[in-house]
């Protein structure tokens, strides 16, 4: 089997290659013109893109995955069972439409489509676990059961420093974005029961408060689900590795096992996620 994912995936390139994940890139546009962003571009190019994202004079947008790019990816594994797994459909209805069209018009591919129901770090921890299961030789029927379990027991929480992102996406008024930025407010978001929909869970003044909240939410979830262990990914965009590594260290000191990795964002589809954040996606296991 072969795993295909979109570049919303926040794994670093070395991990993508080690897990043999085929990644299809979301197109990126700067002021209407195509911008050469990719998961394997050097860090200097990622830093340059982040500055472009922060510049309010620029309009940086993405579009859905392109039909020709999906077909090219599937063609590489035409003789295999393909697990094509993508972030929550509500995040990109255009991608959902293109995927449906490709699946309908190309019966020569043996494809199983999976909607991960999650975004960024949570999407990433799901894809990573699916790719590991495939690499370890898990049979298809068992894999689909595992996918359902992982998806229904995964949560996404994050700290957003770019309050103007919340304004751009309609989650915050302009006045509050201006005042909040001046006061250095950090917004906290969480996944909800509605797949792909993030909701506000408050605001904090510093990363210590943010990480305290994240730890408490995880502990509460573990109690509610009678969890025994956790698998997690922290993704970072912008200068927030100090915050992310503090969270990783604290996760490692909890009373239950937490397997967690920190990954630098690939940046390739971040216009709708803001250029300054770190987030945590985790799956709780009761076995």
Show which residues each predicted segment covers.
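Active-site cofactor/cluster-binding pocket
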Residues: 64-105
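N-terminal glycine-rich anion-binding loop in soluble enzyme alpha/beta folds
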Residues: 2-66
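Conserved phosphate-coordination/catalytic loops
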Residues: 61-68, 208-212
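Structural beta-sheet core signal
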Residues: 3-5, 84, 113, 234
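Mixed-charge interfacial surface used for oligomerization/domain docking
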Residues: 9-33, 90-103, 109-112, 118-287
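Short secondary-structure transition/capping motifs
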Residues: 55-66, 87-91, 115, 119
